[in-house]
Design a protein with these regions (language model features):
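Gly/Gly-Pro- and Ser/Thr-rich, intrinsically disordered tail segments characteristic of DNA damage-repair
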Residues: 1-276, 282-286, 445-502
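Residues at beta-strand starts and edge strands
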Residues: 3-5, 176, 337, 409-411, ...
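DNA-contacting surface of Y-family translesion DNA polymerases
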Residues: 8, 103, 229, 239-410
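Short, charged/polar surface micro-motifs in flexible loops or helix N-caps
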Residues: 12-14, 38-42, 345-350, 420-424
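Acidic, metal-coordinating catalytic segment for phosphate/diphosphate chemistry
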Residues: 18, 369-502
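Residues at or immediately flanking beta-strands
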Residues: 177-179, 340, 414
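Short, well-ordered secondary-structure micro-motifs
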Residues: 191-192, 351-354, 425-428
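Short clusters of hydrophobic/aromatic residues that line enzyme substrate/ligand-binding pockets
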Residues: 209-212, 227, 299, 380, ...
Length: 502
């Protein structure tokens, strides 16, 4: 079997680096955080520059956490400064290192998602100068995998040299630096990038490149902690492993030899992936990823509200989300036969004594370890595959009324169109045999069906016209009355990409 060589490239603090470059600043020497300050200090930071991270700031923390950590760091600087005084501020790391009397400052840059996507496209064009698109998988806006097996001989370069050549081209073209991982499979190149590269010194351009094969992985990372540093090991998986005495990938590998059944009992068929990764194995290739076609598909929309909503106001937002989701179905030529709704409740339902005494239902723990009411979840089947706004909106409204506790404040909602498929592939309602009887007026039924078909055709034309207007003049060029009601969010979200300012 041919030995493959893969490269993973991650653009360093991508959003923050773009914002620095657009300001004519060095991303490696500037304290900058990308966050929408207009959403209050609880907003999530989308990116933090490396210099700001050096003060112990997380790359995905909340803005108030960044401010608090900088405040603490400045308190330490003041204690160590001459005369215990800080005189002036700077957001440049080099200036702060040279002058201990300066206070740490940082720039808060509002996100510009559309602009980051443009930058990402330009960088992808650089990748295409070296690697064919069929050998590249775009993992995210700032991360790619490449199968460079057949390119090393062509360029007469090692994998390390090829990775460096590509990264330096990106740096010269855009001013953005990167980290790379090289491995004999996709898992190893990802882990080399995520874990090993972080612990090696960067070169003068801020570039880090690390390499792993199976034996090196076992030698260097079988004792690494925490487990959540590894690709595809989330907090839930790590917690289960730790509860069963496994704290490292070496522990998982040992368990797979001595008690493999335990892993399958804990994780079902997903144990196979975990065991493979514990040994540094990964059989999936980029070619297989490109050829993969899922057996079933869905479209979804999720949203976390800026403040808790009463159920009726939350229902308005769910209806807005459903309306836009249906338009997305129509635009893609898809239909669905099932809608799924998940509604998460706010922590205030349990922290407010007046509300707490009224709630007697199940309680669960969120990611922050806080107690919240158990989320509502349900599904509703439609009368066949459809992309009718009227039918789907009625179904989701009915589902909301059925599953949501009317006494609880809502914080987040997810709407999913399940079993979606191309409209041309959808089974027709009258494909099967029909049982006739003497008591049904089939002429009236036929007229009723004709009227329904005509209504659906009118609705389809309205949907098509709406899409055409939105595409030409913008998503907010045409709005419904509900989008202007108090608490509606669609108008603001139409100006966003991925929930952040475009």
């Amino acid at each position: 079997m041919k030995q493959h060589t893969y490269i993973a490239i991650d653009l360093k603090s991508f959003y923050a680096s773009v914002e620095c470059r657009e300001r004519g600043l060095d991303p490696l020497d500037t304290n900058l955080v990308v966050a929408d300050e207009s959403r209050t200090d609880k907003t999530i930071c989308l990116a933090v520059t490396p210099s700001l991270k050096s003060y112990g700031i997380s790359g995905r923390g909340r803005l108030f956490e960044v401010k608090q950590r900088v405040k603490e760091a400045n308190a330490g600087r003041q204690h160590d400064a001459p005369g215990h005084r800080l005189d002036g501020t700077s957001h440049f790391f080099s200036e702060l290192q040279a002058n201990p009397s300066l206070a740490i400052d940082f720039i808060i840059a509002p996100p510009r998602m559309a602009y980051y996507m443009e930058y990402s496209t330009r960088i992808y064009q650089v990748y295409l100068k070296y690697i064919a698109p069929e050998d590249i998988v775009v993992y995210s806006i700032d991360e790619v995998f490449m199968d460079v097996t057949d390119y090393l001989n062509t360029y007469k370069l090692s994998a390390h040299d090829l990775a460096m050549k590509i990264i330096l081209d990106v740096l010269e073209t855009t001013g953005i630096t990167a980290t790379a991982g090289i491995g004999t499979n996709l898992f190893l190149c990802k882990v080399a990038m995520d874990i090993v590269a972080k612990h090696i010194p960067a070169d003068k351009n801020g570039v880090r490149i690390a390499e792993l094969d199976e034996m090196k992985f076992r030698h260097e990372l079988w004792s690494h902690q925490p487990l959540t540093d590894f690709w595809r090991v989330g907090r839930g998986i790590a917690k289960k492993l730790e509860q069963n005495g496994m704290f490292t990938m070496g522990d998982v590998a040992l368990c797979s030899e001595r008690n493999e059944d335990l892993l399958y009992k804990l994780f079902g068929k997903n144990a196979e992936l975990l065991i493979d990764h514990a040994w540094g194995w990964e059989p999936t290739t980029i070619e297989a990823i490109k050829a993969y076609r899922p057996s079933s598909n869905s479209l979804s929309s999720g949203q976390e509200l800026h403040c808790p909503y009463e159920p009726q106001k939350a229902k308005l937002v769910v209806r807005e989300m459903t309306d836009l989701l249906v338009l997305d179905l129509v635009d893609k030529g898809l239909v669905t036969d099932q809608m799924v709704l998940t509604v998460g409740y706010d922590i205030e339902n349990l922290t407010d004594p007046a509300r707490r005494v009224k709630y007697h239902g199940a309680v669960e723990t969120d990611h922050y370890g806080r107690q919240i009411p158990k989320q509502a979840h349900g599904s509703i089947n439609l009368d066949g595959h459809t992309s009718s706004t009227r039918k789907i909106m009625c179904a989701v409204s009915e589902l909301f009324d059925r599953i949501v506790d009317k006494n609880l404040l809502v914080r987040r909602m997810y709407v999913v169109a399940n079993h979606v498929l191309p409209e041309a592939d959808a089974p027709k309602k009258n494909d099967g045999a029909v049982q006739l009887d003497l008591f049904t007026d089939y002429a009236a039924e036929e007229e009723k069906q004709k009227a329904e078909d005509a209504a659906l055709e009118r609705e389809r034309k309205i949907q098509a016209a709406t899409l055409a207007i939105k595409k030409k003049y913008g998503k907010n060029a045409i709005l419904k009355a509900m989008n202007l009601e108090e608490g509606a969010t669609a108008k603001d979200r139409n100006a966003q990409i991925g929930g952040h300012k475009a």
